[in-house]
């Protein structure tokens, strides 16, 4: 397997410098990426003369081991674990099936390296978004997104065209709604959040993000990986999972629930889905205790402290059950506010 990779490409090609950089950095040992810009003179006639400068880009990376490459979801999901995949992977233990109970953007599941993955999210629309990256041909998906952007004149910060595109989607009958259409609209929304009203109409306001080269690189690499994985998709209240899945059959359970101390689109009102509060948090603790009693290994990602407020119920529960507790330090979320995240394990490492 190649360890050192060089790529020569010029600025007349179809791929942008930013796109190539995003792709290569995904596979690069940290700090190894380099790019040299080499100007050159291209043959010119009277039609092409003085149109633009010409460059040859020479890219270099030292390639990571395959099991160290991190694939990021194209969905900018609130509470995404994309930035803390390494410590999560370091503390996983062997099993045949990995169950991502609160699947969200699927950043953890797609990087977990288990034989069989089970994705679950109570939000059936989010489940459809994630499964769409497996179900559609990636090239066709990208062309659909680009055509929808062009047809509806979508651009970052353009409120008028965004609201019109959003209304177009919301007013379609359910059998005419294409999940790729929703994905495209989300890309131009505020912080690319996934928010719906009680009628399941998408209602996030316009934002200043767009379908850029970074999103494109994530879409391509994530779609390739999810097509290669053996994934089962579910959309259930997690409490019902033991009735559907035999969790005792060589499974590892990963839980990344909403955070009680933070405000996301999942807990500032139910918005057609289940919210999150003290009662539901205690229900979660009991669910994990039940897994522990059956010797089913599980990992919980959660927030211990945020804006000076500590989750004492979480702390007491960890100590009472003698669970393993791993601090991850301050994590900066979408809001820009740091939060103290932890991993809780019901097994020894």
Describe the role of every protein-language-model region.
Residues 1-122, 241-252, 260-262, 266-349:
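Class I S-adenosyl-L-methionine
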Residues 16, 123, 137, 212-215, ...:
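Helix N-cap and loop-to-helix transition residues
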Residues 68-83, 139-254, 258-269, 283:
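SAM-dependent nucleic-acid methyltransferase catalytic core
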Residues 90, 96-170, 207-208, 212-213:
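SAM cofactor-binding core of SAM-dependent methyltransferases
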């Amino acid at each position: 397997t190649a360890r050192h990779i060089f790529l020569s490409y010029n600025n007349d090609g179809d791929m942008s410098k930013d796109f190539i950089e995003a792709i290569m950095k995904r596979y690069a040992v940290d700090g190894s990426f380099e790019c040299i810009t080499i100007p050159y003179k291209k043959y010119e006639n009277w039609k092409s003369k003085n149109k633009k400068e010409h460059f040859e880009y020479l890219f270099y990376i030292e390639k990571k081991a395959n099991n160290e490459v991190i694939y990021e979801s194209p969905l900018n999901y609130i509470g995404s674990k994309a930035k803390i995949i390494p410590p999560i992977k370091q503390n996983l233990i062997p099993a045949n099936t990995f169950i991502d109970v609160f699947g969200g953007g699927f950043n953890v599941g797609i990087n977990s390296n288990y034989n069989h993955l089970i994705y679950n999210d109570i939000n059936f629309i989010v489940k459809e978004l994630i499964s769409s990256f497996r179900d559609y041909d990636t090239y066709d998906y990208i062309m659909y997104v680009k055509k929808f952007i062009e047809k509806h004149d979508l651009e970052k910060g353009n409120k008028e065209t965004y609201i019109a595109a959003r209304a177009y989607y919301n007013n379609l009958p359910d059998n005419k709604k294409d999940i790729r259409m929703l994905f495209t609209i989300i890309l131009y929304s505020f912080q690319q959040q996934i928010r719906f009203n009680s009628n399941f109409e998408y209602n996030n306001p316009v934002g200043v993000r767009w379908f850029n080269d970074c999103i494109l690189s994530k879409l391509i690499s994530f779609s390739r990986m999810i097509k290669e994985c053996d994934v089962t998709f579910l959309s259930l209240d997690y409490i019902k999972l033991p009735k559907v899945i035999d969790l005792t059959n060589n499974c590892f359970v990963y839980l990344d629930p909403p955070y009680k101390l933070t405000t996301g689109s999942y807990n500032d009102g139910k918005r057609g889905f289940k919210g999150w509060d003290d009662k539901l948090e205690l229900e979660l603790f009991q669910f994990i205790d039940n897994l522990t009693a059956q010797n089913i290994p599980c990992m919980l990602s959660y927030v211990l402290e945020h804006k000076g407020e500590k989750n004492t119920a979480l702390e007491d529960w960890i100590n009472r059950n003698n669970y393993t507790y791993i601090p991850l330090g301050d994590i900066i979320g979408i809001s820009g506010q740091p939060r103290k995240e932890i991993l809780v394990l019901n097994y020894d490492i």
